[in-house]
Amino acid sequence: MVQGCLCWRGCCDLKTSFPWVTNSRRLWMNCIGCNPVWRLRAWGCLAGGTTLMVIWLFWLLRSVPGGAPAPQPTLTILIWHWPFTNRSPELSSDTCTRYGMASCHLSANRSLLASADAVVFHHRELQTRHSRLPLDQRPHGQPWVWATMESPSNTHGLRHFRGIFNWVLSYRRDSDIFVPYGRLEPFSGPTPPLPAKSRMAAWVVSNFQERQQRAKLYRQLAPHLKVDVFGRASGRPLCPNCLLPTVARYRFYLSFENSQHRDYITEKFWRNALAAGAVPVVLGPPRTTYEAFVPPDAFIHVDDFSSARELAVFLVSMNESRYRGFFAWRDRLRVRLLNDWRERFCTICARYPYLPRSQVYEDLESWFQA
């Protein structure tokens, strides 16, 4: 094969290019630049190489940071029971977009069971209404989500749901879909003023049972600390818009959980205390659990004291400088309440790509009670 042709257009001067060759036709047939067959093959190779180069560049642009993201298919999350009500709220197509999660559609339309990407069952309705799960209509491989924000002490009947659910949505940090009651977020605006304090301690409680640890602790505190009790249990209920301004007048708020369980930190801490501007005195999981969510100097844990009397003395004798130190976090952080079930369910879409499809909770009761 002759590759020394001086002209690539098929009109080379063979005698000039190769004066030592006497058979010009043989030379022409073997010249890549002159033979039309070889020219077509060469141009074909060039075109193929160019196509491969374009494909490679397109892949590279999509794979590097800042490249055009691949469009994500819209996920449909079916809510079988809307929590605590027979009617779901309005669920528009952009519901999850409001919470920063695109390509996610929530629906309470049970006719979508066959096509939904995941189905959510809230335990309270399973527990109180004895609703029948649509096991005979379940599509093969469809993930089912068990959801609750209640403590194990108030969650019953889990033995009936062995080997059914794939994922768990709850306040537990080891849940597949972790949804706390609240969190602290970075905040760069001006520090909000601390409400004026005129009273010592407040407690809002609706379900007061003497057998509960919080009731026992309150009985021990009461002789040493002035605590104003609100809620149905005391006959002094507060309207929804009255709770925060009422608690804001108090220096401390008793954030006593109704039961003490792993990661169980509810609105009694996030809303009733932190959002209201009172220092939370907490009874719940260990101090280390609270410190996973907030700075260690943002709350007072009852476990840090040997007795209720010692705790009361600490609260009553606290000077103003020490008291204001519990609000240092407000200079850079703010409370974000996560009490909207729509946002909680939208979180499923954010976690969906990372969750194992083949996982099954064979003993949901043992896992949740642990």
Curated annotation (Swiss-Prot):
Membrane topology: Single-pass type II membrane protein
Tissue expression per record: Expressed in lymph node and kidney.
Keyword Hydrolase among UniProt keywords: no
PANTHER family per the UniProt record, alphabetical: ALPHA- 1,3 -FUCOSYLTRANSFERASE (PTHR11929), ALPHA-(1,3)-FUCOSYLTRANSFERASE 7 (PTHR11929:SF12)
Inducing stimuli: Strongly induced in kidney allograft during rejection.
Any one Gene Ontology BP term: regulation of cell-cell adhesion
Protein name: Alpha-(1,3)-fucosyltransferase 7
Localization per Swiss-Prot or TrEMBL: Golgi apparatus, Golgi stack membrane
Protein's UniProt keywords contain Glycoprotein: yes
Modification note: N-glycosylated.
Transmembrane portions of the chain: 37-59
GO cellular component term of the entry, any: Golgi cisterna membrane
Chief location bin: Golgi
Function of the protein: Catalyzes the transfer of L-fucose, from a guanosine diphosphate-beta-L-fucose, to the N-acetyl glucosamine (GlcNAc) of a distal alpha2,3 sialylated lactosamine unit of a glycoprotein or a glycolipid-linked sialopolylactosamines chain through an alpha-1,3 glycosidic linkage and participates in the final fucosylation step in the biosynthesis of the sialyl Lewis X (sLe(x)), a carbohydrate involved in cell and matrix adhesion during leukocyte trafficking and fertilization.
UniProt entry keywords in alphabetical sequence: Disulfide bond, Glycoprotein, Glycosyltransferase, Golgi apparatus, Membrane, Signal-anchor, Transferase, Transmembrane, Transmembrane helix
Activity regulation note: Inhibited by NaCl. Inhibited by GDP in a concentration dependent manner, with an IC(50) value of 93 uM. Also inhibited by GMP and GTP. Inhibited by N-ethylmaleimide. Activated by poly(ethylene glycol) by enhancing the thermal stability of FUT7. Activated by Mn2+, Ca2+, and Mg2+. Both panosialin A and B inhibit activity with IC(50) values of 4.8 and 5.3 ug/ml, respectively. Inhibited by gallic acid (GA) and (-)-epigallocatechin gallate (EGCG) in a time-dependent and irreversible manner with IC(50) values of 60 and 700 nM, respectively.
Enzyme Commission code(s) on record: 2.4.1.-
SS bonds (residue pairs): 96-104, 239-242, 346-349
Pathway(s) per entry: Protein modification; protein glycosylation
Family: Belongs to the glycosyltransferase 10 family.
Cytoplasmic side: 1-36
